[in-house]
Amino acid sequence: MGPENRRVLLATVLSVAVLIVWQFVFPSPKPKPQPPKPPEAAQRAEAPAAPAPGQPAAQAPAPAVPQDAPEQLVKLVGDGFEATLTSHGGAVKEIVLQGEKFRRDREGKPVQIDLVRVAKEQPYPLAVVATPELGGAEDAGNDVAARAPMRVVAQDARSATFEGRAGKATVRKTYRLTEKAYELALDLEVQAPATQGGGIVVLYPGYMPPDTKKGGFFSGPPVEFVRPVCRAGEETERFDVDGKEAQEKLQGTVAWAGMDQGYFVSAVFPAQPAGTCLFAKGPVQGSGLTALRLPLDGGSAKFGFTVYSGPKDLDHLRTYGREFESAIDYGAMARPFAFFARLLLFVMRWLERLVANWGLAIILLTVLVKVLLYPLTAKSMQSMNEMRKLQPEIEKLKAKHGNDREKLNLATMQLYQQHKVNPLGGCLPMLIQLPIWFALYATLQTSVELYREPFLWIHDLTVKDPLYVLPIAMGVSQYVMQRFSPQPADNAQAKMMLYFMPGFFTLLMLSVPAGLTLYIFVNNLLSIAQQQFMMRRMPAVPAPAKASK
C-alpha cells in the first residue's frame, strides 16, 4: 500500500472513529425540565373510529369506591413473568421477569427485572381515563381518575376483574393470562352516559431517574432506560422524555403503543389497529407517557387488547405481526447495518447451539469471516508486495519532481497503471471489516440473546470488559500486527501506523462492548498468523533505495 493510500485509509478510519467518540464524549446536554404545556385545540380532534365495538346493554352506574379504600393486589403468574395488579386504577403495578438471565444488581444483590418503572406522581401502566373530549395526554396522565381506587369483583389463578368509576363512566377491566410467553389479555368495558361521547385513554407511563445514563455508541441502554414508543400508520416513532418537546401527536392508526426499555419492550395491541397515539412528558423530570386514545360509540363500548411485556426476541416479536420487530432500535449510526446485524445474529445463534457459549460463538464467527475473506486478503497482500517492489521507482519520482505534488501524483499513477498495480488493493480487507464491526456492535446492543451472557471473567458480553484485559490485549495485538506489516518508506507515517493506531484503538475499546473487542482481538491474532504464513510464501523484496539528494 503506497503512502498516499495509507493516508486515505488512515483518514477514513480516523473520521469514523471521531464520529463515534464525539457521540460518547460529547453527548447532547439534557435540557432543563419545562412545565407541561396545555394541549392545543388542534390536538382535540376526533380520533378515527374504533373497529366496530359492540355496545353493552345499559346498566346502572357502579358505586364509586372511597378514595381512602385500602389497596388490593392480585398476582398472576404467566409464562416467563409474574404480574402484580393493583386496585389503584385497576392497573399493573409490577411485571417481574423470571429466570436467572433477567436479573440486575441492586445494592450488590441480584434481583429480578421489573418492567414497571413509574414515578410516584404517575399512574400505573394500563390505567384508563374516560373523557368527554379526547384531550392531551398530559391531562390524562395527571388526571386523578387514572389513580382512582377500583374494587376487585372477581379473581382466580389466571384472571382478575376490576370495576370502578372514571368520572361519570363505569369502567370494568378483566386481565387474563394467555398461552403465550410474556403476554396478558385485557378486556375493557366502558359504560358512559349516551350524551358523553368523547373517548377513553389507555395510559402507559414510564420513568427514568435523571442520573440514568442513556448510553451512547459505546455503552448500551441501561436497565432503567425508558422511552415512549408507538407504531402509528407506517412508522414506528419514539419520544425523548428529556427532549425539548412537551408532547407529540402521531398521525395514523395505532397498531401498538407502549414503552421501549432497551433490551425489553412493553406494548399494548388493540384487537384491530385503531385510535390515535400521543406522547407526553410526565409530571417530573425523566418521566414520560404513551397515551392510546380510542373513541366511545354512543358513550359506551367494549375493547379488547393484547399486552406484551418482555424481551426483544426478534423471532418472538415477529409472531405478533404489525411490524412489532421494529421495536428493536439499532440507533442512528448502526441502523444502516441492521440487515447485517440480523444476519450475524442468525449465524451466531447457529454457532452458539454448537458450542453452548456466546463468547466461543463470537470467536468461531471471527474464524468464519476470516476464512471467507481469505482470497481477498491474499490478493491484498500480493498487491502490497507489488507496491513494495515499486518503492525504489517511487523514490526516484520523488527525487525527480521534488515538491511538485501534482506531477508526482500523476507520475505515480502512471507507474501503477504500467505495472497493473491497484494502490487501493491493500485497503479492501480493512474496509470490508468496518461494516462487520458496526453490525456486530448493533447486534450486541439490541439482541437480548447476548444480554448478560458471560465469557471467562466477563460477566456480560454486551458491556465493557470490567478488568480492561481485552482492550489492552487488543492494543498489543494491533501493535504486533503493524510491526509485521510492510512499512511505508515515510518514517513519520510508519511511526504513526506503528504506535498511534494501536494506542488510539486501545482507548477506543475501553468502553466498547466486550463482545466486539473480543472479535477484533481474535481477528488481529488470525491476521498476524496469516501474514507470517503468506510472507514466507512470497519472494523477498529488496530494501528500497535511498533517494539521491
Curated annotation (Swiss-Prot):
One of its GO terms (molecular function) is membrane insertase activity. The chain crosses the membrane at residues 8-28, 328-348, 354-374, 424-444, 502-522. Keywords: Cell inner membrane, Cell membrane, Chaperone, Membrane, Protein transport, Transmembrane, Transmembrane helix, Transport. Its main location: membrane. Residues 29-68 are annotated as: Disordered. Residues 29-39 have a biased composition (Pro residues). It is found in: Cell inner membrane. GO terms for cellular component: plasma membrane. Residues 40-49, 55-68 have a biased composition (Low complexity). Coiled coil: none annotated. It is a multi-pass membrane protein. Disulfide bonds: none annotated. Required for the insertion and/or proper folding and/or complex formation of integral membrane proteins into the membrane. Involved in integration of membrane proteins that insert both dependently and independently of the Sec translocase complex, as well as at least some lipoproteins. Aids folding of multispanning membrane proteins. Interacts with the Sec translocase complex via SecD. Specifically interacts with transmembrane segments of nascent integral membrane proteins during membrane integration. Belongs to the OXA1/ALB3/YidC family. Type 1 subfamily. This is Membrane protein insertase YidC. The lineage of its organism: Bacteria, Pseudomonadati, Myxococcota, Myxococcia, Myxococcales. The gene is yidC.
